[in-house]
UniProtKB/Swiss-Prot annotation:
Keywords: ATP-binding, Cell inner membrane, Cell membrane, Membrane, Nucleotide-binding, Peptide transport, Protein transport, Translocase, Transport. Belongs to the ABC transporter superfamily. Pfam families: ABC_tran, oligo_HPY. Disulfide bonds: none annotated. ATP binds at residues 43-50. The complex is composed of two ATP-binding proteins (BAB2_0817 and BAB2_0818), two transmembrane proteins (BAB2_0815) and a solute-binding protein (BAB2_0812). It is found in: Cell inner membrane. GO terms for biological process: peptide transport; protein transport. It comes from Brucella abortus (strain 2308). This is Putative peptide import ATP-binding protein BAB2_0817. It comes from the Bacteria.
């Protein structure tokens, strides 16, 4: 399998324009995704995860959000590369849904309530390949069966409200994969599902990825999911990457206080009962994610950080190399141990 990246983002900077000023939502982001690899993008709400994925898809609100700098190099099915940050909307439409698929967090908002499931799943084939409606429907039925929806032909004729939450999410996965994309963005695809269905969806996505060899960017705040599905992890805070590296290494040896805080905040089996017995509380990260319009000077995490020193407030730290594959945006990373 080729190890040329499917996706190579360098220096991505995304800006939102308000009446008063321009606000930087994503700043100096670098992400590489290889064929067959899953990279998890994690952080609290407001960290810039979803804006990063919407920037890749070029789905930012028109006249409000725009890519101000950087490149997003995609290697499509033809093997040719294209900079998604530089092409016009017409060219992007030919790529979106064809070379790149996206699974959204809430299927009821990404499925049209007035069209049948089969019509919606088959639409990318009609748009990108000129497939007839009948052929597109047959392909949709086949894919619904592959993603584990029983009685697929009948379900293809139903509307979104007639399916359970788990079935709707399977349908959105089918819609994202119908054109066999080389790259998939999964933006919090299991958040709205119960734990049992969540596990089934994760297993399904891993199976489909294994069969196709596509690269995947998995956006989530759930570190338990990251440990299960991803090979590498990118941690974002206030629009910047603060740590990145192989999942096992970052989880075992985090070198940024924010990553440490996220890991320590994860509830584990048996924790609640034992902590209640001892009169203890679950670990939390003090404070709140700052608003992007009012970021503190220096390191944005410094006001919440127990490791912060005066120098942390003076300038934004560079992303330092812990080793060849592991980076941390902390001037004290060498002193930090979980």
């Amino acid at each position: 399998m080729s190890r040329q990246p499917i996706l190579d983002i360098e220096g991505l900077r995304t800006v939102f324009r308000t009446r008063a000023r321009e606000i930087v939502a994503v700043n100096d982001v670098d992400i590489v995704v290889n064929p067959g690899e899953t990279v998890a993008l994690v952080g609290e709400s407001g960290s810039g995860k979803s804006v990063t994925s919407l920037s890749i898809m070029r789905l930012l609100a028109r006249k409000v959000g725009f890519i101000d700098a950087g490149s997003i190099i995609l290697r499509g099915k033809s093997g040719q590369t294209v900079d998604l940050a530089a092409i016009d909307e017409e060219a992007m439409r030919r790529i979106r849904g064809n070379d790149i698929g996206m699974v959204f967090q809430e299927p009821m908002t990404s499925l049209n309530p007035v069209y049948t499931i089969g019509d919606q799943i088959g639409e990318p084939l009609r748009v990108h390949r000129g497939t007839s409606r009948r052929e597109a429907l047959e392909a949709a039925v086949e894919l619904l069966d592959r993603v584990g929806i029983p009685d697929a032909r009948r379900r293809a004729g139903q509307y979104p409200h007639e399916l359970s939450g788990g079935m709707r999410q399977r349908a959105t996965i089918a819609m994202a994969l119908i054109c066999n994309p080389t790259f998939l963005i999964a933006d919090e695809p299991t958040t709205a599902l119960d734990v049992t269905i969540q596990a089934q969806i994760l297993d399904l996505m891993q199976k489909l990825q294994s069969e196709s060899g596509m690269g995947m960017l998995f956006v989530t705040h759930n570190l338990g999911v990251v440990a299960e599905i991803a090979q590498r992890v990118v941690v974002m805070y206030a629009g910047r990457i603060v740590e990145s590296g192989p999942v096992k290494e970052v989880f075992r040896n985090p070198r940024h206080p924010y990553t440490m805080g996220l890991l320590r905040s994860m509830p584990r089996l048996g924790d609640a009962t034992e902590m209640k017995r001892r009169g203890e509380k679950l670990n939390t990260i003090p404070g709140m994610v700052p608003g992007l319009a009012n970021l503190p000077s220096g390191c944005a995490f410094a006001p919440r950080c127990s490791f912060a020193v005066e120098a942390c407030h003076a300038a934004v730290p560079p992303l330092a190399s812990v080793n060849e594959h592991h980076g941390s945006r902390c001037i004290r990373w060498q002193e930090i141990a979980a």
